[in-house]
Amino acid sequence: MSSGGLLLLLGLLTLWAELTPISGHDRPKFCYLPADPGECMAYIRSFYYDSESKKCKEFIYGGCHGNANNFPTRDKCRQTCRGK
C-alpha cells in the first residue's frame, strides 16, 4: 500500500475512534453524577461529563467538596468518561 493510502487509512481509523464512545457499561459510575461546584468560593475552570449529551462540558469548581465528576482538562474528562 502506498504511503498516501496508509495515511488515509490512519486518518479514517482516528476519526472512527474519536466518534465512537465507549459503552455505558465501561464508563465509571461517577461520570453520571451532575456537575457539583462544591461549597468553597474559588474560581477553578473544570470539566464534567454530561451523560445526557455525552460530552465533556466546562463548569466552575469552587475548590472543595464537589464530586468525582470533576476534571482539570477536557481531555482528561474524555479519557475517563468517553474513552478518548
Swiss-Prot record:
Residues 1-24 form the signal peptide. SMART domains: KU (SM00131). The lineage of its organism: Eukaryota, Metazoa, Chordata, Craniata, Vertebrata. Coiled coil: none annotated. It comes from the Eukaryota. Belongs to the venom Kunitz-type family. The record marks M41, A42 as: Reactive bond for chymotrypsin. InterPro entries: Kunitz_BPTI, Kunitz_BPTI_sf, Prtase_inh_Kunz-CS, TFPI/VKTCI-like. It comes from Daboia siamensis (Eastern Russel's viper). This is Kunitz-type serine protease inhibitor C3. Keywords: Disulfide bond, Protease inhibitor, Secreted, Serine protease inhibitor, Signal. GO terms for cellular component: extracellular space. Residues 31-81 form the BPTI/Kunitz inhibitor domain. Pfam families: Kunitz_BPTI. It is found in: Secreted. Expressed by the venom gland.
